[in-house]
């Protein structure tokens, strides 16, 4: 969802930066933000801190990051360019669509409702629905099952490397969206095509 349907990556980056500043933590690598993209926040926390974190602390810090994110995005977030028109085209052709996201159910419903996109999807699978986050394929396999489409017949749009890995492990085709990673990185991860957004994207893609 983030970076594919909703243009929210800058707000997430700012929220993680605020959390690290609050904790007085300096990331081990300058591109620390990439460690978080596409992952549930509870799984991103130990990667950012560079140490083992127990479940209680992971949830506490993930909740704090969420507070920062909601503060930064309180005035709303835009949809990724062209996504609404593309979803209209899919609906006109009766193509079933699902969301498979590492975001929470509450944030997913809130953001997609605000943008008028939630009703476009036959199924929404979120962080609460899976035992293992991306790059594990579980979220994508659950989404495919929910819309009754074989994984090999699914096409995924992903901006995150771990998301591309998850979709590929699920046996799905993937198109990369360059809102978070560079084209070369997405192609190395296994996407078959790369787009900047949904302007000019048509179905079949």
Name each model-derived stretch.
Residues 5, 34, 79, 97-100, ...:
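Conserved SAM-binding loop
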Residues 1-93, 106:
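N-terminal helical cap/lid subdomain that shapes the substrate entry/recognition surface
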Residues 74-76, 99, 115:
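Conserved phosphate-binding/catalytic loop of the ribokinase/pfkB sugar-kinase fold
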Residues 16-18, 68-70, 96-98, 127-128, ...:
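N-terminal start-of-chain detector that recognizes signal peptides
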Residues 10, 101, 110:
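Conserved catalytic-core motifs of eukaryotic protein kinase domains, centered on the activation segment
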Residues 88-91, 104-205:
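Asp-based, Mg2+/Mn2+-dependent phosphohydrolase catalytic module
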């Amino acid at each position: 969802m983030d970076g594919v349907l909703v243009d929210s990556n800058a707000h997430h980056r700012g929220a993680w930066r605020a959390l690290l500043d609050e904790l007085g933590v300096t990331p081990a690598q300058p591109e620390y933000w990439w460690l978080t993209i596409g992952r549930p926040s509870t799984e991103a926390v130990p990667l950012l801190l560079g140490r083992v974190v127990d479940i209680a602390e992971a949830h506490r810090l993930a909740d704090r990051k969420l507070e920062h994110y909601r503060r930064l995005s309180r005035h709303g977030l835009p949809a990724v360019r062209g996504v609404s028109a593309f979803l209209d085209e899919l609906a006109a052709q009766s193509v079933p669509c699902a969301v498979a996201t590492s975001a929470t159910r509450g944030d997913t419903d809130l953001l997609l409702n605000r943008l008028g996109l939630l009703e476009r999807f036959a199924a929404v699978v979120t962080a609460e629905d899976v035992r293992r986050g991306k790059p594990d394929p579980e979220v994508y396999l659950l989404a495919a099952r929910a819309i009754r489409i074989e994984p090999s017949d699914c096409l995924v749009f992903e901006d995150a490397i771990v998301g591309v890995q998850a979709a590929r492990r699920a046996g799905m085709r993937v198109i990369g969206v360059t809102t978070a990673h560079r084209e070369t990185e997405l192609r190395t991860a296994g996407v078959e095509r790369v787009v900047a957004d949904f302007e000019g994207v048509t179905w079949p893609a």
